[in-house]
A protein has these predicted regions:
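Charged, solvent-exposed interaction patches on well-folded alpha/beta domains
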Residues: 1-133
Length: 133
């Protein structure tokens, strides 16, 4: 299970993206925030690959790279991303090849630290074509 937030409302969803109902305050599930207006009702669907990606990333990312409040962000055009504590935004996209994406991100983070580059965005959505700026 995970939580899916749209606007100020938060819903409990299953791994297939089906909305179960309103989330209870204090639920300890991974949170996915979608920045759009609208409402969800039980039985509606959200992108299952985004739910699965956020849950998997909460397990794959080492503690220093976990997002504050276990909150992952979702946008239809970029998929799942994480606002890191150091100010970087890291785009992971969908739930495909997440172990590779995390390993690639960690290698890029080490390279960024080594060179002292100033970074705002790291994108590992596409195997073989990661980048940062």
């Amino acid at each position: 299970f995970a939580q899916w937030q749209v606007g100020s409302a938060t819903f409990l969803v299953d791994r297939d993206g089906r909305v179960i109902g309103p989330a209870a305050r204090g639920d300890a599930f991974v949170l996915v925030r979608e920045n759009r207006a609208g409402a969800l009702n039980p039985g509606d669907s959200v992108p299952a690959e985004a739910v699965r990606a956020a849950v998997a990333l909460s397990e794959l990312l080492p503690p220093q790279w976990q997002p504050p409040g276990d909150a992952f962000d979702y946008a239809p055009d970029t998929g799942i991303s994480v606002a890191m504590r150091n100010g970087w935004r890291v785009r992971f996209g969908d739930d495909e090849e997440l172990a590779w994406k995390v390993a690639t991100f960690q290698a890029l983070a080490a390279e960024i630290a080594r060179t002292g580059a100033r970074v705002q965005l790291v994108d590992v959505r596409f195997p073989g074509r990661p980048y940062y700026r």
